[in-house]
Regions:
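Residue-level hotspots at or immediately adjacent to binding/recognition sites across diverse folds
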Residues: 1-178
Length: 178
């Protein structure tokens, strides 16, 4: 909504599942967070300058009333999965443009649309559901949810994943977006 919620448009994303949250990632780029680890990358197109990609679902939405009545937007939707089947609950934009996402069953993901063009996902060994995430800097976060607030480090999760110590049970996944 461009007018702080006074008017809305409904757009068919083509996604059959539930969406739990969303975030504006950049000008004309939005991430929609869904169930089972699914992310929809929605890109707003300028219909006078860009042709929609044939391999992506395209949606059209128009405002119906208010000061934007009749204003229409064209979006393409790219479906991605973070590498695991855990629902996603919250997202924040980091200082460098990446997106940090919290999710159920210990999931923390970092989406990099521009540099690495990937999604890195940690599934914490505690498997506690996370409902929100706060950036502490240096790839460290506060995650809140089941059983309170915890500090999380993506680099520590990766070190735990590659460790030979059987007591460390974190999992780490990388999905290529290019």
């Amino acid at each position: 909504s461009p007018d702080k919620g006074l008017t809305w448009m409904t757009i068919d994303t083509g996604y059959p599942g539930s969406l739990w949250s969303g975030i504006k990632a950049d000008v004309g780029i939005y991430l929609l967070l869904g169930m089972s680890g699914n992310i929809i990358i929605a890109k707003e197109l300028d219909p006078n300058a860009e042709e929609p990609s044939a391999d992506k679902f395209t949606g059209l939405g128009c405002f119906e009333g208010g000061m934007y009545d009749g204003d229409c937007k064209v979006f393409t939707f790219e479906y991605q999965n973070i590498g695991v089947k855990n629902s996603l609950t919250n997202a924040i934009i980091l200082d460098d443009g990446r997106i940090a996402i919290s999710g159920n069953s210990g999931t923390v993901s970092i989406v990099d649309l521009y540099n690495k063009k990937n999604i890195e996902t940690c599934v914490r060994s505690d498997r506690l559901s996370n409902t929100s995430i706060v950036n502490l800097g240096n790839d460290e976060f506060l995650i809140a949810g089941q059983k309170g607030v915890r500090k999380h480090s993506m680099s520590q999760c990766y070190e735990n994943f590659v460790s030979d110590d059987p007591a460390l049970q974190d999992s780490y996944y990388t999905v290529d977006l290019s």
